[in-house]
């Protein structure tokens, strides 16, 4: 048999207290009577009652004494026992949890296909998935701009450009500088990812240096430092320095404090070490002095910056567009050089040949020449607009112009502007007199090459307005305007051998002398009749357009034969023949006269 373990003291005490708290009950007594005499007394428990009574009394007293002692201890250590019990319970719980985790871990180790997942403690933050980029992770352009900013801030050891400048530091700064900039603001913009390209970062850097050179005088430390930083910064951020891996653009590694200049770089610098050291430890007084080589590099950096800004502006306003200029090649061909190329860092310039194949479409099958066909949408009709129609109808020279009449005006004056100008000039001198009208007509004839007079004659012929042909009108005007017209007519009398019958010229001088007042009325009536006949003839001829086949037309009518067919036989003494139809001057000379000649 195994060894019997004793109960724990606390458990024994609790069981004893439970037993002591129970009230003691007296056993029942049984009295048996046999034949009227008492026999024996049996207790319900089967023990002696006297012995039980003595023992119960003794235990009761002992229990009372222990109870008194326990009350004293409980009053003193009651609060201590509660805390100890709580601590013990917590420690037991922790031990149980550890043992439970260890047992589960050992059981899971035997299962190779099952993954062990251990929950991290609640105070540690939950890690994000590595495949997803973190929110605070910087982009490549941000890393590049942060590197540039660190390099630029190292060139400002005193921190002049580290923070924004206020009016308390520099009086009147806000009145002079409208767009302030500093390294702190640039850093905030880098963190906020407001720079979309290096060009914008360079623009803010140049703005900061320009503000310092604008506010400060050239002999101040701030001006010299700003100019020095501007030159070094643009040189560092130039494309050539980035491609060659210059010492300023290479990422610097931490070096011992004893060495003032970094020696190890990603690539070897083209400059000797002495020149680099002299540049970095150059005194502030000589910061403004630039040699020819450094000045050229500075100008080159500024030109590259301006070119980058222009390229970005073009790409922003015309995305995908190609702007450039024409240049002639060595062999004489034309090339179109593109400025805003898709790859600005490309070594070769983007060019396109300019020839007929690039300007015209392909030759269609069956055609031997490249024809040009203008689209209907490109055709401009001047009469389609309401403004043109109103402006043409409201003129006082020609009212209610028709489409064919407008075509005549356009053929004479060229375009709408020319028509309006001609009509405006004629309307201006409408009531000014014949001399002003003649001056305007001569001016328009000189401009249009004589088309003005021919157009007016055709228009008035269509409207049945009597008017001399332009050639005859000019001849008549020149003869009427000359002061020596009578002498010229008289001088023609000395030429009897001419083919024209000039016998009527001898009677021109006698007309005014021999006319009586009574005969003047008769002459006026005849002149009126002749004018009416002329008007009817012009209306008859002007109403119909001449046909293209003039050779197949019939002979002249009887009326035309009456006016044009009969030769004039004027004598010196016949006065009434002067008032005949003026068309008689257009007839051909008689055959007899020609025979004489």
Curated annotation (Swiss-Prot):
TM region positions: none
Cross-referenced Gene3D superfamilies: Bromodomain-like
SMART domains per the UniProt record, alphabetical: BROMO
Molecular functions (GO terms): lysine-acetylated histone binding; nucleic acid binding
Compositional bias annotation for Low complexity: 544-556
Source taxon at top rank: Eukaryota
InterPro entries for this protein: Bromodomain, Bromodomain-like_sf, Bromodomain_contain_prot, DUF3512
Residues joined by cross-link Glycyl lysine isopeptide (Lys-Gly) (interchain with G-Cter in SUMO2): 373
Biased composition (Basic residues): 1-10, 63-73, 86-97
All copies of domain Bromo, residue ranges: 136-240
Leader sequence residues: none
Cellular component annotations (GO), alphabetically ordered: chromatin; GBAF complex; nucleoplasm; nucleus; SWI/SNF complex
Region described as Histone H4K5ac H4K8ac and histone H4K5bu H4K8bu binding: 214-216
Region Disordered, annotated ranges: 1-25, 38-138, 536-597
Key words of the record: Acetylation, Bromodomain, Chromatin regulator, Isopeptide bond, Nucleus, Phosphoprotein, Transcription, Transcription regulation, Ubl conjugation
Histone H4K5ac H4K8ac and histone H4K5bu H4K8bu binding (site feature) positions: 169, 222
UniProt xrefs under CDD domains: Bromo_brd7_like (cd05513)
Entry-annotated residues carrying Phosphoserine: 56, 566, 588
Pfam families, A to Z: Bromodomain (PF00439), DUF3512 (PF12024)
GO biological process: chromatin remodeling; negative regulation of cell differentiation; positive regulation of cell population proliferation; positive regulation of stem cell population maintenance; regulation of transcription by RNA polymerase II
Compositionally biased intervals (Basic and acidic residues): 11-25, 50-62, 74-85, 111-126
Chain positions with N6-acetyllysine modification: 373
Function: Plays a role in chromatin remodeling and regulation of transcription. Acts as a chromatin reader that recognizes and binds acylated histones: binds histones that are acetylated and/or butyrylated. Component of SWI/SNF chromatin remodeling subcomplex GBAF that carries out key enzymatic activities, changing chromatin structure by altering DNA-histone contacts within a nucleosome in an ATP-dependent manner. Also orchestrates the RAD51-RAD54 complex formation and thereby plays a role in homologous recombination (HR).
Quaternary structure note: Binds acetylated histones H3 and H4. Binds butyrylated histone H4. Component of the multiprotein chromatin-remodeling subcomplex SWI/SNF called GBAF, which includes at least BICRA or BICRAL (mutually exclusive), BRD9, SS18, the core BAF subunits, SMARCA2/BRM, SMARCA4/BRG1/BAF190A, ACTL6A/BAF53, SMARCC1/BAF155, and SMARCD1/BAF60A. Interacts (via N-terminal bromodomain) with acetylated RAD54. Interacts (via C-terminus) with RAD51.
PANTHER family: BROMODOMAIN CONTAINING PROTEIN (PTHR22881), BROMODOMAIN-CONTAINING PROTEIN 9 (PTHR22881:SF4)
Protein name: Bromodomain-containing protein 9
Protein source organism: Homo sapiens (Human)
Gene designation: BRD9
